Amino acid sequence: MSKVIEVNHPLVLHKLSMVRSKDTGSKDFKELVKEISMLLTYEATRDINMDEVEIETPVCKTKCRVVSGKKMAIVPILRAGLGMVDGVLSLIPAAKIGHIGLYRDEETLQPVEYFCKLPKDIEERDVIVVDPMLATGGSAADALTMLKEKGAKNLKLMCLISAPEGIKLVQEKHPDVDIYVASIDEKLNEKGYIVPGLGDAGDRLYGTK
């Protein structure tokens, strides 16, 4: 079974309180999502591969550890996932970016892909899938399935807020994918919103309703 890592660092909790507030405007909301994403990335890359190299300081030669040449990719689930990309890139600037867009057919309830653009060598990369909200878990699970079908092997999922229902579904369908989240909230309401949540992340990021 995959691990679920709830990142309860004081800075994450502080910024999360502001991102939840209905009084936080779109501009500040975007910046907070970026900052929380950066802090989550710090945790999600704790097991990143490293190499030992020799460098020369102004005083002497010494050995240091640096991130290895392992390739990475960031894949946001459109559209809200785009708000997390800059925060991740601030720590992993060399990562390639893919995009996945999908929706559910109202009659069949099956996922319908409307956009998918990934690095050509996705099978060689460590992949972090990002989406601010993990509610029912359907979109995240479908995106992970699509990535695996296209060759991706080493996957992680990173979200700001999740519901227990979403975590359960992703773990059932993808027991090999670890989940990094700033908060595991109480539940989903009858409309499928996370409670207490933060509302619709996409609408708040882009000022739409």
Curated annotation (Swiss-Prot):
Broad EC category: transferase
Where is uracil annotated to bind? 194, 199-201
Tell me which UniProt keywords the record has, alphabetically. Allosteric enzyme, Glycosyltransferase, GTP-binding, Magnesium, Nucleotide-binding, Transferase
Domain of life assignment: Bacteria
* Entry EC number(s): 2.4.2.9
Residues folding into a coiled coil are none
Q: Which reaction does it catalyse?
A: UMP + diphosphate = 5-phospho-alpha-D-ribose 1-diphosphate + uracil
Pathway(s) per entry: Pyrimidine metabolism; UMP biosynthesis via salvage pathway; UMP from uracil: step 1/1
Pfam families (UniProt xref): UPRTase
Is the keyword Nucleotide-binding assigned to this protein? yes
Provide any one GO MF term from the record.
uracil phosphoribosyltransferase activity
Q: Which NCBIfam families match?
A: PRK00129.1, upp
Q: What is this protein called?
A: Uracil phosphoribosyltransferase
Q: According to the entry, what is the taxonomic lineage of the organism?
A: Bacteria, Bacillati, Bacillota, Clostridia, Eubacteriales
